Structures are given as structure tokens and as C-alpha cells.
Amino acid sequence: MKEKIAYLGMGIWGFCLASLLANKGYHVVGWARNAELIAQLQTEKRHPQVPDVPIHPNLSFTTDMAEAVENASMIVEGVSSAGIRPVSEQLKTITNLNVPFVITSKGIEQHTGLLLSEIVVEIFGNDASQYLGYLSGPSIAREVLKGCPCSVVISAYNPDTLKKIHNAFLTPTFRVYPNSDLKGVALGGALKNIIAIACGISDGFRFGDNAKSGLVTRGLHEIRKFATIMNCRPDTLNGLAGLGDLCTTCFSSLSRNTKFGKLIAQGMTVAQAKAEIGMVVEGVYTALSAYQIAKHHKIDMPITTGIYRVLYENLDIQEGIAALLQRNTKEEYL
């Protein structure tokens, strides 16, 4: 009998990783609230966002969360950052966490400033920490689905949990590197989306590669400063969860955050750009949370502040660019 894994969330990234696990021989049950999506997956055997990819026979779908998690040896979530609280609350009514719970979403909760792992612990209690894992890194879903080589990191507080998750996801083309700094891994994946929006704006104005590389480098500096204040290891941000994810998100034509930045640079409103993309743009929500936390801790994050002001205070983009370029220069410190 195949080992069962429950996957909560069937967006393109959830479908991608669920397919990877199914290909490894696991019986994967994908869950989503969207009954129309689940019906389409069941009947058409294709995901609407990647219709060229057939559904693996080891992958089935349901709208019943209890059915999805029953007898599962691992639970993986792939919902939006805004969805992890209601999904975790629903899961709590069904079961306590006593198997590895893998977070694959990237973000910071608005208004509370909590990392997604902290939300899960708040709902399930401190004992849940031993089952928590975090998967992050430079990973475009469509490339992973094609079997292109990809390297990510897995982090967990408990060594046994880390080993189980590592072994579940590792394939010849999906390289999984352990990292014990769960908070740093989580922050790297969340904050890079803000910098990606800035890079998209740069693309929209055709500022070129020099400007974009400058944004990526100074953006990484902001992320490292933020993470250090939050008691993360700075070296984590030099690896796959930081620099690696940042580069992919900022330079890939498939990045929704970069696309979003480009669209607003071309004159769309925030609402219009989000509607055009048609998927969650996590950087929009993370910008608010990161700005509020940075302000509270007095962390100087000019790129993040600029993006926040454009998105939430209607700052003219040209004025925001001018403000960045007119800042006093100082000794480069990375």
C-alpha cells in the first residue's frame, strides 16, 4: 500500500509539488476549497494553469479536508499566505499535528506580522513546532513540472522531521538541501517578493540590467538587515532561500511579482494589475507587513519603503524612483 501524503491547496505550485510527490510513488490527495477547480481536475485530468501536463495516476483530489488528511503520513500546505490561518484553523477541528507539516507558501501575515510557521504554532500550540517544516528556494513551478533541475532548501526544528521531509521531496532533478534556520528560510522567501516588484517596475521603465542588478544587490542587503534584527542567520540569506530565490523571482519572465511591478509601471492600478495576473501576488501583501515591522524596529529599508508607499499611499512611481536615486551614498556594507 502506497504511503499517503495530503496536499492542502491546488494552485499551480501546490499542483507542481503534489505531482512531484506522486511521481515518487506516494499516494497524494490534493485538497482545495474551490469545488469547481476540484471537479475540473477530477474530470479533465488537467490543471487549468498547466493544461499540457497530465495528472499522475497517484494524485487524486477532494474538497473534503478530513478525507485528504485521514491516515496521511505527511501534510503539505500550498495555499496563499492569507489562507494559511483559515486552513490551519479548519485542520485543527479535524486533527492535531502529529505528522510532518510542510509549509511551502511565502509571506508574512498582514496586521500581525507573524511568519506562516508562527501562525501554525499559534493555532496548534508549541508542541506543533516539532512537526513543522519549511520548503523554499528558487523554484518556478512550470520548470519543476518539466523536470528541469532545481535546488531548494528544507528547514525544520526537529532533525527527524527534517529527514522525513528531505527524503520525501528529494529527486535526481529536485535537489533538497537541509537548513536549520527555519525563520531565515521563511523570511528570505517572503521578502524577495517585494524586491521583485521593484525589479518589475524597473523593467516597465526599461531601465536596463544595470539598474536591475543594483536593485537585487541592495534588496538582498535590506533582506539581510531585516533578518538579522529578527534573529536569523545572515548566511541563510546568502543561500538558496535568500539570494537564490531573489535572483529567480527578479529575473524570471514567469515571476508574477515581477510581472505585477511591470504592469503598474506601465500605468495600471494595483487592482488592475492583480486582475491581469489572475493569481495571488504575495509581494503586495508582504510589503505592508514588512514595512510595519521595519518601522517598528527602525530598520532602514528604502526599497521596501518605496514599494509600500507606491502600493498603499499612492506615491507616484516616478517620485519614488527619484527618492531612491537621491539618497545620500555611504560605505557599501553587505
From Swiss-Prot:
PANTHER family, from UniProt? GLYCEROL-3-PHOSPHATE DEHYDROGENASE, GLYCEROL-3-PHOSPHATE DEHYDROGENASE [NAD(+)] 2, CHLOROPLASTIC
Q: Specify the pathway.
A: Membrane lipid metabolism; glycerophospholipid metabolism
* SUPFAM superfamilies attached to this UniProt entry: 6-phosphogluconate dehydrogenase C-terminal domain-like, NAD(P)-binding Rossmann-fold domains
What does the UniProt keyword field contain? Cytoplasm, Lipid biosynthesis, Lipid metabolism, NAD, NADP, Nucleotide-binding, Oxidoreductase, Phospholipid biosynthesis, Phospholipid metabolism
Its name, as the record gives it, is Glycerol-3-phosphate dehydrogenase [NAD(P)+]
- Which one GO biological process term can you cite for this protein? glycerol-3-phosphate catabolic process
Catalytic center residues:
192 (proton acceptor)
What GO cellular-component annotations does this UniProt entry give?
A: cytosol
Q: Which parts of the sequence bind NADPH? A: 13, 33, 106, 141, 256, 280, 282
